[in-house]
Amino acid sequence: MCFLIEPLIKIDAKIIFLHGAVSDQRNAELTKLLLSKIRSAGKVPGMATHYPLQTIPFIHQNKLDCSAILLPFNLKGEFMGNQKAVEKLVDSLDYFFIAMKPLAAGKISPKEAFPYLGEHNISAVTVGMVTEEEILETVTEAKKVFK
């Protein structure tokens, strides 16, 4: 498996996330090695997960040097697994959580989505947008919740 950490270091990325394909293997030895490489380059190490109920406890129990966690998190529970359990887990831990899929692949409007995120321990959000209309609607609603 190829790990493209060096190119991200060269372009001066501030945070470098391990892809979910790596994080969700929950291989402590490999994960520690990659996170150490990121930290030793002076970057903030993070991990993405598509299986938060399995991978976040793995991160926490192994005391991994992971400052930020990117996970699916949205009002409808899409892509989250057990929504209530993920909410409880996120709200109970001190990590910089970043929500992905906050609009549940277009099933939730930004107006509905962002207040929900603001009720939980979500520090940032990443949203896929295609049209100018989507950009304006999403950014306008995000500014109302995230300051």
Where are the regions that the model predicts?
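Active-site beta->alpha loop and helix N-cap motifs at the rims of alpha/beta catalytic domains
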Residues: 1-26
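Beta/alpha (TIM)-barrel catalytic core signal, keyed to glycine-rich beta->alpha loops juxtaposed to Asp/Glu
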Residues: 19-147
